[in-house]
A protein has these predicted regions:
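Conserved Walker A/P-loop ATP-binding site and its immediately adjacent core
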Residues: 261-284
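Pre-Walker A (Motif I) flank of P-loop NTPase domains
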Residues: 229-236, 261-263, 315-317
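Walker A/P-loop
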Residues: 230-253
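Alpha-helical scaffold elements adjacent to nucleotide-binding pockets in ATP/GTP-utilizing enzyme cores
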Residues: 69, 73, 88, 251, ...
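Inter-Walker segment of RecA-like/P-loop motor cores
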Residues: 286-317
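Conserved pre-motif I regulatory segment
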Residues: 7, 200-237
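Accessory nucleic-acid engagement/destabilization modules that flank
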Residues: 1-203
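Post-Walker A helix-loop "phosphate-sensing" segment adjacent to the P-loop in P-loop NTPases
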Residues: 254-263, 285-289
Length: 317
């Protein structure tokens, strides 16, 4: 068995690392510490004992839910900030809940918190909290949300994603080390830039001196100049055959290096165009560094590494 404290610590640190790019490490770390607090309950420990053939007749093993305890602690101790954590903790196995409403009477978070409020009185939970809560502190949110609906919602979803991914990966590392090792490590985007531009420059030199190729070179140069600007929304309008894929990728590499971005993500409206784009990028970056992920992907092209990468988009492109 993996000790609860070890799992919580591992998930906390991994989630914090995932949240570092959007300055939310402390929030994600506390999510990791709280997410399985309910597993300290006597009833959950009885459930584990029964499931492993160990006698434990003193407690009811039928109730083995565990996500409510951390959510209850967060809302009780941290107020409005705690509700943000509560959404993520309560939903880390089943999806983010609504505050009110929901498909079932107790599916909404408000109802769940009211129903499970007594979980914090469990002696085991009390002991666990007493041993750890001195370190459970939060800074102010890293953003000022002018649009509290959309901005706050997206931030909660990002925190939730950090928690879910960290929880899954730490459990996988403990339960299935071979699968975890199969995830491999990908090169940083910066490491792919040099071979990409070397091949792109060579392709441009080999191209015959035609008017079309002159315009393609101008488009690429314009894209690379635009990459020096501050992050935001950019528009590229080029006729068919104008070299959009490679010019846009050149922009993406330059912009990522300039502003410390870690991924290039293509979101394209037709699977046929996704396939063409992915094939082009593989020629420049190699098969292993480009993840093609859409509903029409041919399973025969999949490898174990690509299936694992599709779970959390770890590939650089």
């Amino acid at each position: 068995w993996q000790p609860l404290e070890a799992h919580a610590a591992n998930v906390a640190e991994m989630a914090a690392a995932f949240a570092r790019p959007f300055a939310s490490q402390a929030w994600a770390r506390l999510l990791g510490e709280l997410h399985d607090l309910g597993k300290a309950r006597r009833s959950f420990q009885a459930y584990l004992s029964r499931a492993n053939g160990l006698a434990d007749a003193d407690y009811d093993a039928s109730d083995h839910s565990h996500s409510g305890a951390g959510a209850c602690w967060a809302t009780r101790k941290l107020g409005a900030a705690g509700r943000i954590l509560a959404y993520c903790v309560a939903g880390h196995h089943v999806g983010l809940p609504d505050w009110i409403g929901g498909e079932t009477p107790n599916g909404a978070l408000a109802a769940r918190l009211a129903e499970e409020a007594g979980v914090l009185d469990d002696p085991n939970v009390k002991a666990y909290v007493a041993a750890h809560e001195a370190a459970w502190r939060l800074p102010a949110p890293p953003f000022r949300f002018t649009d509290k609906g959309m901005g706050l919602s997206l931030w909660i979803r990002m925190l939730y994603s950090c928690l879910v991914d960290a929880d899954f990966l730490d459990t996988e590392a403990f339960m299935d080390a071979r699968r975890a090792e199969g995830r491999g490590s990908y090169p940083a985007l910066d490491d792919l830039a040099a071979p990409f531009f070397a091949e792109l420059d060579a392709k441009q030199r080999r191209a015959p001196a035609t008017e079309v190729n002159r315009v393609r070179a101008e488009i690429r140069a314009a894209c690379e100049r635009a990459a020096e600007e501050m992050p935001g929304l950019f528009s590229l309008t080029v006729p068919t055959g104008g070299g959009k894929t490679l010019s846009a990728t050149a922009f993406a590499f330059r912009h990522a290096r300039k502003h410390g971005k870690r991924r290039i993500i293509y979101v394209i409206p037709y699977t046929s165009i996704i396939e063409q784009t992915a094939d082009t990028l593989r020629q420049f970056l190699g098969d292993a560094n480009v993840l093609e992920h859409h509903s029409n992907f041919d399973p025969e092209k999949e490898t174990q590494a690509s299936r694992l990468a599709a779970e959390n988009w770890d590939a650089p492109v």
